[in-house]
Design a protein with these regions (language model features):
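General nucleic-acid-binding
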Residues: 1-17
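Terminal helix-turn-helix DNA-binding modules in bacterial transcription factors
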Residues: 3-8, 35-74, 96-98
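Basic/polar phosphate-binding segments, predominantly the helix-turn-helix DNA-binding elements
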Residues: 12, 16-48, 68-90
Length: 98
């Protein structure tokens, strides 16, 4: 249920929100997420956002800036850096590849 909540609320979910919603302590929740996903809460949210961004880049004509905002990044340069680090290419390069 926690993982589904993160998937559905990836844009603005915080560890504080999750802890409050599921009546769990933040340390316990952090450990649980790490055990279930293999990554930290922050890394998990980033992975979900990047996956959603990839899908949008392939299936829409939205600008990279709008996609960044849609998946929860206010700064497009930050989004571009994270995307390039994750996929070894910029969002534009990803969109243009065949």
């Amino acid at each position: 249920e926690i993982m589904n909540y993160i998937q559905a609320n990836y844009i603005d979910v915080t560890l504080d929100d999750l802890a409050e919603k599921f009546y769990l302590s933040k340390p316990y929740l952090s450990k649980y997420i790490k055990e279930k996903s293999g990554v930290t809460f922050g890394e998990l949210v980033k992975k979900v956002r990047m996956k959603k961004a990839r899908a949008m880049l392939k299936s829409s004509s939205m600008t990279v800036e709008n996609i960044a905002l849609t998946v929860g990044y206010q700064n497009v340069e930050h989004f571009n850096r994270l995307f390039k680090k994750a996929y070894n290419m910029t969002p534009v390069q990803f969109r243009n590849q065949k």
